[in-house]
């Protein structure tokens, strides 16, 4: 059921699937998880406000996501402290995207809270720390923002409205076309 919900592209199909699934599924707890996922997917659709979560900056200050991203078109991409090669590749991608799309702010988000090792690594690699944040609550944020892959990319307008909630930051051609598509929007 999880994969079906994640792969459907329109609400009518979701609702039809959920009605059928509710009739054959004997496990109410699992059904509730699927309903919750569907709700999160609907919240991440284009035109909706980005669900507000708590984030942490490099020095441990906690802030809300809307405060962190308000005022400029923003691209969110994700990384894990356990996969530093992935982080390095994403930083290289972000640098290329920044050159092509300077009207966007590119923000890397660690799915784990910051630690000193990451701070040191970012300093050695000359990474702009003002554009690096970390999740405060992994469980809540990955559920609210439907972060099921580290290559996920989210594009926001300057008012934290979602322009693209399910981009693939790691697939350059596809993601560049999304950035181009939303280039003229606030």
Predicted regions and their residues:
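A structural signal for short secondary-structure junctions
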Residues: 47, 69-70, 100-102, 145-149, ...
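Short, internal strand/loop/helix patches
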Residues: 122-158
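Loop/turn elements at helix/coil->beta-strand transitions in domains of secreted/extracellular proteins
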Residues: 70-73, 102-105, 129, 158
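Structural microenvironment flanking redox-active thiols in thiol-disulfide oxidoreductases
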Residues: 85-125, 137-143
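Oxidative protein folding and maturation machinery
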Residues: 1-62
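Short active-site neighborhood of thiol/selenol oxidoreductases, capturing the structured segment around
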Residues: 63-94
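Thiol-/selenol-based redox modules, centered on thioredoxin-like
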Residues: 155-186
């Amino acid at each position: 059921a999880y994969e079906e919900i994640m792969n459907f592209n329109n609400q009518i199909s979701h609702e039809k699937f959920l009605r059928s699934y509710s009739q054959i599924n004997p496990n109410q707890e699992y059904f509730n998880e699927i309903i919750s996922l569907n709700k999160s997917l609907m919240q991440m659709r284009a035109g909706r406000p980005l669900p507000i979560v708590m984030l942490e900056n490099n020095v441990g200050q906690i802030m809300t996501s809307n405060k962190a991203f308000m005022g400029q078109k923003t691209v969110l991409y994700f990384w894990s402290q356990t996969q530093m090669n992935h982080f390095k590749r994403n930083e290289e991608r972000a640098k290329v995207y920044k050159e092509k799309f300077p009207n966007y702010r590119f923000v890397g988000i660690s799915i784990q809270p910051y630690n000193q090792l990451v701070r040191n690594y970012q300093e050695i690699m000359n990474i702009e720390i003002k554009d690096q944040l970390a999740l405060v609550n992994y469980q809540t944020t990955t559920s609210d923002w439907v972060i099921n892959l580290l290559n996920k990319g989210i594009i926001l307008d300057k008012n934290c409205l979602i322009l693209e909630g399910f981009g693939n930051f790691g697939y350059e051609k596809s993601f560049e076309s999304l950035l181009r598509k939303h280039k003229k929007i606030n």
